Curated annotation (Swiss-Prot):
Promotes colloidosmotic lysis by binding to the midgut epithelial cells of lepidopteran larvae. One of its GO terms (biological process) is sporulation resulting in formation of a cellular spore. This is Pesticidal crystal protein Cry15Aa. The gene is cry15Aa. One of its GO terms (molecular function) is toxin activity. The keyword Cell membrane does not apply. It comes from Bacillus thuringiensis subsp. thompsoni. Keywords: Plasmid, Sporulation, Toxin, Virulence. Residues 318-340 are annotated as: Disordered. The keyword RNA-binding does not apply. It comes from the Bacteria. InterPro entries: Aerolysin-like (IPR004991), Insecticidal_delta_endotoxin (IPR011218). The lineage of its organism: Bacteria, Bacillati, Bacillota, Bacilli, Bacillales.
Length: 340
């Protein structure tokens, strides 16, 4: 549940705490007055800008590419999709004053995307109403325009699937402002910055008009600290961001009906949401399987691709050396496939 300070109530409470011990029993303070204080130095500062996010699949769409000729073709898998992203802001510890206090902020957050172990930078733009605990949600649309060349073998069909992954993260935010008192209200000391005053009967000195300055607010709540002249109030907010992180195109290759051939799956390079960064398939990490990596140095032909054959019986009958696939790697992929 949100916490809310009220400067007027806190000023009255601080005055009671300070003057209370000196009030003659049986009497009640009179002529209570809240002076025209000022608010300034309104600041918003993120508490953390580095996040680790586990991505989740947000959207996928597929298209088929056909090659019914006897020669390999280069075709293009093209996608143009848009996804809605949200930024929700909630004040968790706010303050009420005589005026509306709000501030806008823009900052860059760095997000470590787990599974691909890459960091992207995103700009978060928000606005905070210090006196409202209502969650404010803004939406934007991000476009994903992908055009990837794909080699389609003879008499084959290739299914290209665009997969868009998103992630959520929450930015803790620190809010602060200063409370300035009104000067010229205290007789004999016109420079005293009065915030609140009341008249009471002092047990020893009789009738007294007692003024307090903004720094006294710390007596009412630990949300305030004193700098000797003003009170500095500190609060909190949260900003929850849900946005696209990266996209990847999965390629499923299979022979057309009535033709023999290999069936395989592989991934095209990843596109991060800050689109200037393109990742090669080998950087996807263990969470997204790469079906056609480059063999290690123990293979007979170092630059030969490893192909996973989904037809397991044909796969077992093949001569791995002739296909340029290492025995140990072929056995490993066979075991991995059996587990699926």
């Amino acid at each position: 549940m949100a916490i809310m300070n009220d400067i007027a109530q806190d000023a009255a409470r601080a005055w009671d705490i300070i003057a209370g011990p000196f009030i003659r029993p049986g009497t009640t303070p009179t002529n209570r007055q809240l002076f025209n204080y000022q608010i300034g130095n309104i600041e918003v500062e993120p508490g953390n800008l580095n996040f680790s996010v586990v991505p989740e699949l947000d959207f996928s769409v597929s298209q088929d590419l056909f090659n019914n000729t006897s020669v390999q073709q280069s075709q293009t898998a093209s996608f143009n999709e848009s996804r809605t992203e949200t930024t929700s802001t909630a004040v968790t510890h706010g303050v009420k004053s005589g005026v509306t206090v709000s501030a806008s902020a823009k900052f860059n957050a760095k997000i470590l995307v787990k599974s691909i172990e890459q960091t992207i930078t995103t700009t978060v733009s928000t606005e905070y109403n210090f006196s409202s605990t209502t969650t404010r949600t803004n939406t934007v649309t991000r476009g994903w325009s992908i055009a990837q060349p794909v080699l389609v073998p003879p008499h084959s069909r290739v299914t290209a699937t665009l997969q868009i992954y998103k992630g959520d993260f929450t930015v803790p935010v620190l809010l602060s402002l200063r409370v300035y008192g009104q000067t010229g209200t205290l007789a004999g000391n016109p420079s005293f910055p009065s915030l609140y005053a009341a008249t009471y009967e002092n047990t020893l000195l009789g009738r007294i008009r007692e003024h307090i300055a903004p720094p006294a607010l710390f007596r009412a709540s630990n949300a305030y600290i004193s700098n000797g002249v003003q009170a500095i109030w500190r609060g909190t907010a949260t900003t929850r961001v849900s946005q696209g992180l990266y996209s990847v195109v999965r390629i499923d290759e299979r022979p057309l009906a009535g033709y023999s051939g290999e069936t395989r799956t592989y991934y095209l390079p990843v596109t991060l949401s800050n689109s200037s960064q393109i990742l090669t398939p080998g950087s996807l990490g263990s969470e997204i399987p790469i079906i056609n990596p480059v063999p290690n140095a123990s293979c007979k032909k170092e630059n030969s691709p490893i192909i996973i054959h989904h037809d397991r019986e044909k796969h077992r009958e093949r001569d791995y050396d002739k296909e340029h696939i290492c025995h140990d790697q072929a056995e490993k992929y066979e075991r991995d496939y059996d587990k699926e």
